[in-house]
């Protein structure tokens, strides 16, 4: 049973998958999307679902700090609804407040990554953090 974690933005979707036991999350890739052109990367996502034999999605939900749902969270929920419909797999949501900030801080402090390098991996690392937080919260 593998779970796929997604960090959905307006231009990219960071993708992570769990190990078979559901203990750890690993970053896979960043899928380029374009909301304005309604290109959401579903074809590539489908390839990854098959390759990793995914049984569930976890989509990051970027709530506001006061716990309200804003436009980005609504867009993430719409993305979740669409992938649930397309792939006929369950979708859970994980609060992702500050995960991108945490990911950026990690890359600066631990990896000493340049701004250009951080930009290339930040969404994938955020997807890992979203999925790992979900796995930790739902461990048996």
From Swiss-Prot:
InterPro entries: RNaseH-like_sf (IPR012337), YqgF (IPR005227), YqgF/RNaseH-like_dom (IPR006641), YqgF/RNaseH-like_dom_sf (IPR037027). Belongs to the YqgF nuclease family. GO terms for biological process: rRNA 5'-end processing. PANTHER family: POLYNUCLEOTIDYL TRANSFERASE, RIBONUCLEASE H-LIKE SUPERFAMILY PROTEIN. Its EC number is 3.1.-.-. One of its GO terms (molecular function) is nuclease activity. GO terms for cellular component: cytosol. It is found in: Cytoplasm. This is Putative pre-16S rRNA nuclease. Could be a nuclease involved in processing of the 5'-end of pre-16S rRNA. Its main location: cytoplasm. Keywords: Cytoplasm, Hydrolase, Nuclease, Ribosome biogenesis. It comes from the Bacteria. SUPFAM superfamilies: Ribonuclease H-like (SSF53098). It is an enzyme of class 3 (hydrolase). The keyword Membrane does not apply.
């Amino acid at each position: 049973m593998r779970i796929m974690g997604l960090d959905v933005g307006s231009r990219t979707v960071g993708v992570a998958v769990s190990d078979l036991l559901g203990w750890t999350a690993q970053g896979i890739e960043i899928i380029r999307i374009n909301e304005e052109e309604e290109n959401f990367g579903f074809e590539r996502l489908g390839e990854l679902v098959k390759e990793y034999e995914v049984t569930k999605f976890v989509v990051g939900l970027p709530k506001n700090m006061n716990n309200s749902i804003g436009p980005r969270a609504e867009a993430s929920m719409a993305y979740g609804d669409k992938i649930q419909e397309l792939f006929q797999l369950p979708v859970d949501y994980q609060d992702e407040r500050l995960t991108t900030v945490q990911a950026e801080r990690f890359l600066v402090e631990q990896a000493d990554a340049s701004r250009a390098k951080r930009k290339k991996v930040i969404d994938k690392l955020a997807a890992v953090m979203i999925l790992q937080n979900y796995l930790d919260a739902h461990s048996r």
